[in-house]
Amino acid sequence: LIDQNTQKLMTMDVSYTIVTKPINGIQELKLPLIQDTLTNYHYLRVLKDNRIIFGGEDEAFGGELDYDKANKKYLSLLKNLKKMFPCFEDKIEIEYSFCGLFASTTNNLGIIGKSGRDNIYYFLSCGANGIINTFCGVDILLDLFSSKSNEFEKYFSPQR
């Protein structure tokens, strides 16, 4: 559905995530969301059931998932999580782990365009600024649907 020019604007990365078993006492810390951008991009959320979702350590996708590398990433995440919470170090265990692909562009703007097929539009690759891109993207798409021009369309164009 998308052309080669659009594909050239995107890069694919892998992000890794672990979910802990419930940790008694973690809710008492009242942590909403933590993002550590200094050490290979880590983020965490504490869930109502006392689990922690901890992820990051993003890297370029090489075309095929390397399960050995993924397992090493999960263990690295566990080690880093324990460093963040030394008082819970003995209680932190992985219950689930998973990874996923995401697309980005070099300037972190999404790609919005019309497919070669009738009435099919696309909005791809929100990257690191997904919420901001989404707000802009919705306005651009609504204008495209209505055949109106939009001053920001050129920044999101696959021909930029």
Model feature map: region roles:
Residues 1, 11, 49-83:
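Conserved FAD/dinucleotide-binding core of flavoprotein oxidoreductases
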Residues 1-47:
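Flavin-dependent oxidoreductases
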Residues 17-19, 43, 53, 93, ...:
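Structured core elements
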Residues 21-23, 57, 115:
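Generic beta-structure capping elements
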Residues 25-26, 35, 59-62, 101-102:
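Short, catalytically relevant binding-site loops at active-site mouths
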Residues 47-50, 116-117:
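Short acidic-glycine loop/turn motifs at beta-strand connectors
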Residues 62-68, 82-160:
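C-terminal catalytic lobe of FAD-dependent flavoproteins
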